[in-house]
Amino acid sequence: MEYFDMRKMSVNLWRNAAGETREICTFPPAKRDFYWRASIASIAANGEFSLFPGMERIVTLLEGGEMLLESADRFNHTLKPLQPFAFAADQVVKAKLTEGQMSMDFNIMTRLDVCKAKVRIAERTFTTFGSRGGVVFVINGAWQLGDKLLTTDQGACWFDGRHTLRLLQPQGKLLFSEINWLAGHSPDQVQ
């Protein structure tokens, strides 16, 4: 289990100066050729997403104005807050800030032939499945994960195991990304 606080994470500026990324975790850890990766990006200007052949990307707008995603003849999609959207990471996708203001989004990328992610917003206590990896990011409220208290802009990632996330207040929202390994693959085979 790895814990993080977005406010204390290192920031990587994009080469095109249109934004920045905070990498949460990769699996396998510290590998450039990852099977899955979670990150938070701040987008300051219109531009294209980086290409990642063989990967799927699920992007969830956390804050800021809506973002229009365009991919030639494949799709035009308006990304709205807390509504995950998946697309192939090897296609050219342009992002346009519809309200002209900076936006922040959560990204999870998975290698299509190894694993698949599912992203949802939780508003009540839940328990993860034991054989799956995952990432949680607190949008608001206070959540208990084991003996650790997680509050706004904090989270955790894990590569397997069963975990209960308990909402400690009447209201709260948490982004949860679950990683499902495809047949013939598991985290034990990779490490």
From Swiss-Prot:
It comes from the Bacteria. InterPro entries: RmlC-like_jellyroll, RmlC_Cupin_sf, Uncharacterised_HutD/Ves, Uncharacterised_Ves. Transmembrane segments: none annotated. SUPFAM superfamilies: RmlC-like cupins. HAMAP family: Ves. PANTHER family: PROTEIN VES. Belongs to the Ves family. This is Protein Ves. It comes from Shigella boydii serotype 18 (strain CDC 3083-94 / BS512). The gene is ves.
